[in-house]
Curated annotation (Swiss-Prot):
It is an enzyme of class 2 (transferase). Mg(2+) binds at residues 152, 181. GO terms for cellular component: cytosol. This is 1-deoxy-D-xylulose-5-phosphate synthase. It catalyses: D-glyceraldehyde 3-phosphate + pyruvate + H(+) = 1-deoxy-D-xylulose 5-phosphate + CO2. The gene is dxs. Pfam families: DXP_synthase_N, Transket_pyr, Transketolase_C. Thiamine diphosphate binds at residues 80, 121-123, 153-154, 181, 288, 370. One of its GO terms (molecular function) is 1-deoxy-D-xylulose-5-phosphate synthase activity. Catalyzes the acyloin condensation reaction between C atoms 2 and 3 of pyruvate and glyceraldehyde 3-phosphate to yield 1-deoxy-D-xylulose-5-phosphate (DXP). Homodimer.
Length: 620
C-alpha cells in the first residue's frame, strides 16, 4: 500500500518525531484525525491489532510532541496500542506489513527502531523496566525523561504493583500513564476536571505544595493539616488514593482524546520530581463506530472492508482446537458440578465464552494474573474441586514457580489446558509456544499429553481431568482441527503410545499435531510411524521396541529441541545403553519471528517436504 499524500496532507508532513514537533499546535487535531483514518485504512488491508491503537492516537501525538523522543524514553506496555507510535516514528509507509513475514514487528521491538525502548508482547512489564531505565539515566547524569504507558488491564497484574511499590520507595523521576479504556469517558472527565488536572500538575501548585512542606516541616500539626487538606481536595474529584499511597503524585482522570489538554498536562508534569501518575480515559476503537461498540471483536482483526462495519465470517470449515476444548469443557461441566474453569484474561482466545455464559458460577477470569490463576487452582483442588486452567503456552511461563511449588509438589489434581502450543504465527517471538514441553517435562509427577488430532485431544482432556494422582497438561496448537471423527470419551492408558504404521529400517516417533506431515513422510520413506501421545511418562517399552526393530529413530515435535520430547527419548535410550542413531526434529535454538504458521513451518523445515529433506540429509 502506497502512502496517499492527498488523502493525508498533514500526516504526510510527519515521518519522524522531529517533524512532528515542527508542526504548529493548532494542526494537531487534524493530524490526529488523519492518523486515525490512516490506521483504519492500513490495518483493514493488512490485518493486525486494531481497536487499542484507535484509542491512543491523541496520547501518542501528545507524548511525541512534548517529549524529546527518542532521547527521552517512551515505553509501551504489551504493545497492542503502539501502532500510531510506529507510524509517527519513521515506519509510516511500512505499517501495512505489520505482523507479516519480513515486515514490521507486531509490538515495539528494540531491533526495529531506536524509538522502541523495550521489546514487549507480554503484559505488565513497562513500569519495572521504566524504573530501571530511569535509575540508569540518573546514575549516568543523563537529563532524560522516562514515560511508561500501561493499560487498565495490564495494571491489574501483580508485577505492575510490585514495580509501583518499588518506585514509591526509591522515588525515581518518571511518569506512568494509565490508559483507562474500560468504559466511556465518565462525567468527571470534562472541562472542570481537565482544568483541575492542569492546575494540580502545574508549577504553581507544585511549588506551593513543596514550599509549604519545607516551611512547616518543623511544625508537625500544621504539616499534617496541610497533608490532610491536600488529600481531601484531591480526593473530592480524583480516584487516585491507591496510587498516592504507593508513593506517586496522581493526576487525573483526564480526557485522553483531547490532544491539546494532554499536551498542557504533559508539559506541566514533564519536569516534576519523583514518580508521577497520569490517569487518562480513552475509548477503545475511537473513531470507528463498530469497534467502539464491540472492542473485543475488533481488538485484533483480519483483513476487512471498513465500509461494511463487519469482520468477515469464518468459512464454516473445521473448528479450532480452542473450540474443541470449549465444547469439551461445557460437556464435562454439565455432568460434573465439581469442575471449575480458570483463565487469566483469555476468555475469547481460549474458547471459554459459552462456558462463561452457561456456568457463570464456575467460571473465573482472574485477569492478567497467571501466578494467581495457578495457585488459586491449587486451592480449589485442596477444597475438593476439579480445576481446569486454560492458558496459552507462552503465558504459562509466567507461573512456573506456582506450577512446581503450589501444584506439583503437593500432587494436586489440577489440569492445564495449554492452548497456542508450538508455532503461533503473526505475533512473533513473544507468543510462540516453544518451551512448554521443555519446562514441564522436568517436573516430578507431571503427566504431559500431546494429541495428534481433535479426537485425541478430547480423550486426553477427559483422561487428564479424571487423573487424581497429580497435575496433568494437555497441549494443543493454534488453528483448525483436522476433521477426524469424534468418538465417545474414554480414559487413555497413561504413558502408552500407539503404532500407526509399520515400516522398515526407520521409525518416526511423533509428539502432537505434526502427525499429518509425519504420515506423509512415513509413507514416502516406508517408515514406521508412532503416535507417542505422552511426553511424560514416556512409553519406554515402545521406544526400546522401536530401537530394537529399526536401524534409526526420528523424533518429531513442535517444541524446542533442547529439553523437549526428543531429549526424553534420547535419555531413555542412553539409560538402557541402546546405541541407536536418533535425529531430533523440532524448533531450533532461536526465537521464531512473525509470519503465518505455514510460512514458519516451511522455513524451519517442519512441513512434510522439510521433514523428509532433514531425514534424507541426515541419512546421507
Amino acid at each position: 500500500m502506497s502512502f496517499d499524500i492527498a488523502k493525508y496532507p498533514t500526516l504526510a508532513l510527519v515521518d519522524s518525531t522531529q517533524e512532528l514537533r515542527l508542526l504548529p499546535k493548532e494542526s494537531l487535531p487534524k493530524l490526529c484525525d488523519e492518523l486515525r483514518r490512516y490506521l483504519l485504512d492500513s490495518v483493514s488491508r493488512s490485518s493486525g491489532h486494531f481497536a487499542s491503537g484507535l484509542g491512543t492516537v491523541e496520547l501518542t501525538v501528545a507524548l511525541h510532541y512534548v517529549y524529546n523522543t527518542p532521547f527521552d524514553q517512551l515505553i509501551w506496555d504489551v504493545g497492542h496500542q503502539a501502532y500510531p507510535h510506529k507510524i509517527l516514528t519513521g515506519r509510516r509507509d511500512k505499517i501495512g506489513t505489520i505482523r507479516q513475514k519480513g515486515g514490521l514487528h507486531p509490538f515495539p521491538w528494540r531491533g526495529e527502531s531506536e524509538y522502541d525502548v523495550l521489546s514487549v508482547g507480554h503484559s505488565s512489564t513497562s513500569i519495572s523496566a521504566g524504573i530501571g531505565i530511569a535509575v540508569a539515566a540518573e546514575k549516568e547524569g543523563k537529563d532524560r525523561h522516562t514515560v511508561c504507558v500501561i493499560g487498565d488491564g495490564a495494571i491489574t497484574a501483580g508485577m505492575a504493583f510490585e514495580a509501583m511499590n518499588h518506585a514509591g520507595d526509591i522515588r525515581p523521576d518518571m511518569l506512568v500513564i494509565l490508559n483507562d479504556n474500560e468504559m466511556s469517558i465518565s462525567e468527571n472527565v470534562g472541562a472542570l476536571n481537565n482544568h483541575l488536572a492542569q492546575l494540580l500538575s502545574g508549577k504553581l501548585y507544585s511549588s506551593l505544595r513543596e514550599g509549604g512542606k519545607k516551611v512547616f516541616s518543623g511544625v508537625p500539626p500544621i504539616k499534617e493539616l496541610l497533608k490532610r487538606t491536600e488529600e481531601h481536595i484531591k480526593g473530592m474529584v480524583v480516584p487516585g488514593t491507591l496510587f498516592e499511597e504507593l508513593g506517586f503524585n496522581y493526576i487525573g482522570p483526564v480526557d485522553g482524546h483531547d490532544v491539546m489538554g494532554l499536551i498542557s498536562t504533559l508539559k506541566n508534569m514533564r519536569d516534576l520530581k519523583g514518580p508521577q501518575f497520569l490517569h487518562i480515559m480513552t475509548k477503545k476503537g475511537r473513531g470507528y463506530e463498530p469497534a467502539e461498540k464491540d472492542p473485543i471483536t475488533f481488538h485484533a482483526v483480519p483483513k476487512f472492508d471498513p465500509s461494511s462495519g463487519c469482520l468477515p465470517k469464518s468459512s464454516g470449515g473445521l473448528p479450532g482446537y480452542s473450540k474443541i476444548f470449549g465444547d469439551w469443557l461445557c460437556e464435562t461441566a454439565a455432568k460434573d458440578s465439581k469442575l471449575m474453569a480458570i483463565t487469566p484474561a483469555m476468555r475469547e482466545g481460549s474458547g471459554m465464552v459459552e462456558f462463561s455464559r452457561k456456568f457463570p458460577d464456575r467460571y473465573f477470569d482472574v485477569a492478567i494474573a497467571e501466578q494467581h490463576a495457578v495457585t488459586f487452582a491449587a486451592g480449589l483442588a485442596i477444597g475438593g474441586y476439579k480445576p481446569v486452567v486454560a492458558i496459552y503456552s507462552t503465558f504459562l511461563q509466567r507461573a512456573y514457580d506456582q506450577v512446581i511449588h503450589d501444584v506439583a509438589i503437593q500432587k494436586l489434581p489440577v489440569m492445564f489446558a495449554i492452548d497456542r502450543a508450538g508455532i503461533v504465527g503473526a505475533d512473533g517471538q513473544t507468543h510462540q509456544g516453544a518451551f512448554d514441553l521443555s519446562y514441564l517435562r522436568c517436573i516430578p509427577d507431571m503427566v504431559i499429553m500431546t494429541p495428534s488430532d481433535e479426537n485425541e485431544c478430547r480423550q486426553m482432556l477427559f483422561t487428564g481431568y479424571h487423573y487424581n494422582d497429580g497435575p496433568t497438561a494437555v497441549r494443543y496448537p493454534r488453528g483448525n482441527a483436522q476433521g477426524v471423527a469424534l468418538t465417545p470419551l474414554e480414559k487413555l492408558p497413561i504413558g502408552k503410545g500407539l503404532v500407526k504404521r509399520h515400516g522398515e529400517k526407520l521409525a518416526i516417533l511423533n509428539f502432537g499435531t505434526l502427525m499429518p506431515e509425519a504420515a506423509k513422510v512415513a509413507e514416502a520413506l516406508n517408515a514406521t510411524l508412532v503416535d507417542m501421545r505422552f511426553v511424560k511418562p514416556l512409553d519406554d517399552t515402545l521406544i526400546l521396541e522401536m530401537a530394537a526393530q529399526h536401524d534409526a529413530l526420528v523424533t518429531l515435535e513442535e517444541n524446542a529441541i533442547m529439553g523437549g520430547a526428543g531429549s526424553g527419548v534420547n535419555e531413555v535410550l542412553m539409560a538402557h545403553r541402546k546405541p541407536v542413531p536418533v535425529l531430533n526434529i523440532g524448533l531450533p535454538d532461536l526465537f521464531i519471528p512473525q509470519g503465518t504458521q505455514e510460512e514458519a513451518r516451511a522455513e524451519l523445515g517442519l512441513d512434510a517436504a522439510g521433514i523428509e529433506a532433514k531425514i534424507k540429509a541426515w541419512q546421507a
